[in-house]
Amino acid sequence: MHKANQPRHHNPERTRARLLRAATRLFSNFGYDGVSVDEIVKAAGVNKRMVYHYFENKEGLYAEVLRSVFSRLADIEQRTFDESRDPVEGIRQILVNYFQFLGDNPEFVALLSWENLRQGRFIDEHPQLLSKNPAISSLREVLNRGMETGVFHDGIDPKHLLISLISLCFIYHSNRYTLSHSVGLDLHSPAVLRQGLSHSIDLVLNGLLKRT
């Protein structure tokens, strides 16, 4: 039988992955409200019914996009804190990894920005998607080790620290276009981003280290 006459076999994993890739790109560019199911299936090159087969509806597909992107960062957070026995190195490394992740995953920055523009309505309905409880728990352990050994000063709140860690890294990527003009630094430049990372590490550690 010639190849042209052979039946085409459906590959569920490939079809699902194509839908996720297309949806991630479109939701990142236009937000949840700016994208239709028709546009997603056209970009993915699959039948429309596949969306409802794998994800039930547009909301289910969007939830899976967020879960897929956010879980990658959660894995990095968990691995970083678990592998860093030295508290100072743990804090330094999570900042390095945040900068790296945000630079490598612009869709994460865009999706989170869109969710904030929507007042987090979707996250309110699916709070487990963006829960930082595991990261807070792991960061608390790092801080406790630092305080017990006298490296960090007492009274550091892990929730506020996590917000600071994320914020310092996030703004270099989320606001790079506007800040590049307003402060006169090219935030697209790898050299400038390295300077920003070094500055963020120094700033955080100077605030955590116990003064002698």
Show where each model-derived region lies.
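Generic hydrophobic, amphipathic alpha-helix propensity
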Residues: 15-23, 40, 65-69, 73, ...
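Short coil/turn segments at alpha/beta junctions that flank glycine-rich nucleotide-binding fingerprints
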Residues: 29-33, 84, 105, 149
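Helix-turn-helix
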Residues: 18, 26-60, 64-65
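C-terminal peripheral helix-coil segments that are non-catalytic and often amphipathic
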Residues: 1-3, 97-100, 104, 133-149, ...
